[in-house]
């Protein structure tokens, strides 16, 4: 009985792994169709799954990821080490770089958080290193997103 169970478990695990890989590829295709808010365009920097790694993700337990930070393997022009970092708003279907050229070495880790202005109710995305704010980005609504 145990001999039959082991190959079955291996088959199920392999199938789940392949489904997860395919899902990541589908997510990347969907993101490349989102509205680019500022250059460089996401689709100009990323063409397939190997070009990007997920840096950070904010997840709503009912709807899945709401915000994601994706780090690319391509370095900005004039930058020896470093990567492009893109903020992806899964609900508004927008993508924008954190900065046009965020030249940060791979060993530096950033912290991320979404902040809502208590007066205007506008949403911002902040990124910091060692507790020091490095940048703040407005998370705009997308009028083209008619869901």
Swiss-Prot record:
Q: Which Pfam families match?
A: YfjS_YafY
Q: Which key words tag this protein in UniProt?
A: Cell inner membrane, Cell membrane, Lipoprotein, Membrane, Palmitate, Signal
Q: Where is the signal peptide?
A: 1-20
InterPro entries assigned to the protein according to its UniProt record, in alphabetical order:
YfjS_YafY_dom
Q: Name one GO cellular component term.
A: plasma membrane
Q: How does it sit in the membrane?
A: Lipid-anchor
Lipid modification (S-diacylglycerol cysteine) maps to: 21
Lipid-substituted positions (N-palmitoyl cysteine)? 21
Q: Cellular location of this protein?
A: Cell inner membrane
Which residues, by range, are in coiled-coil regions? none
| Summary of the function given for this chain in its UniProt record | When overproduced strongly induces degP through the activation of the two-component envelope stress response system CpxA/CpxR.
Give the family this protein belongs to, as stated in its UniProt record. Answer: To E.coli YfjS.
| Full protein name | Lipoprotein YafY
Organism listed in the record: Escherichia coli (strain K12)
């Amino acid at each position: 009985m145990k001999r039959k169970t082991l190959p079955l478990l291996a088959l199920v695990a392999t199938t789940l792994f392949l489904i997860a890989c395919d899902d990541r590829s589908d997510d990347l295709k969907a993101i490349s169709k989102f509205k680019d808010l500022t250059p460089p365009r996401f689709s100009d920097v990323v063409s397939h799954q190997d070009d990007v790694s997920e840096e950070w993700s904010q997840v709503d337990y009912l709807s899945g990821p709401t915000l994601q930070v994706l780090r690319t393997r391509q370095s900005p022009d004039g930058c020896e080490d470093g990567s492009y970092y893109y903020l992806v708003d899964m609900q508004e279907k927008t993508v924008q770089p954190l900065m046009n050229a965020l030249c940060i070495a791979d060993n530096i880790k950033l912290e991320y958080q979404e902040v809502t202005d208590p007066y205007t109710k506008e949403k911002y995305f902040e990124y910091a290193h060692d507790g020091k704010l490095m940048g703040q980005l407005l998370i705009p609504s997308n009028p083209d997103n008619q869901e």
